[in-house]
A protein has these predicted regions:
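A beta-strand edge to alpha-helix "cap/lid" segment located at domain peripheries
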Residues: 1-27, 32-121
């Protein structure tokens, strides 16, 4: 896979999140996913896709910038800044974060880990 291919997968992940399409999102996520939110809360694939489906996180928009991608055999690491417009439990919120996503080729490229932290001011 190329760096551009990984960035395209990231954009598909963001689109599925904003569309609230838990099925499309689930297809992009590894069964062993660990998703660490900028709040420090941690979700599995099951709990994260359920939260998207039930609108616990109702993503309005996700804008990525300053993305870097490194591909190493069957793994790829994406590091970027994110500006996320989301309703959390119905409460509108703007999240500015720095995120790391790890994709693996395990019979198809899927995201196995996301770790987000608040962006420095």
């Amino acid at each position: 896979v190329t760096k551009d291919g990984i960035l395209e997968l990231e954009q598909r992940r963001f689109k599925a999140m904003c569309d609230g399409d838990a099925d499309a999102l689930g297809a992009l996520l590894h069964n062993d996913l660990t998703y660490t939110h900028s709040s420090g809360a941690v979700d599995s694939k099951e709990s994260y896709t359920r939260g998207v489906r039930e609108k616990l996180w109702d993503y309005q928009s996700i804008k990525a910038s300053d993305a870097t991608v490194s591909v190493h055999g069957g793994a790829a690491v994406v590091h970027c800044r994110l500006r996320i417009d989301v309703k959390v439990g119905g409460v509108p919120k703007i999240v500015e974060s720095v995120a790391l996503a790890v994709w693996v080729d395990d019979g198809g490229w899927t995201c196995i880990a996301v770790h987000s932290t608040p962006a420095p001011k």
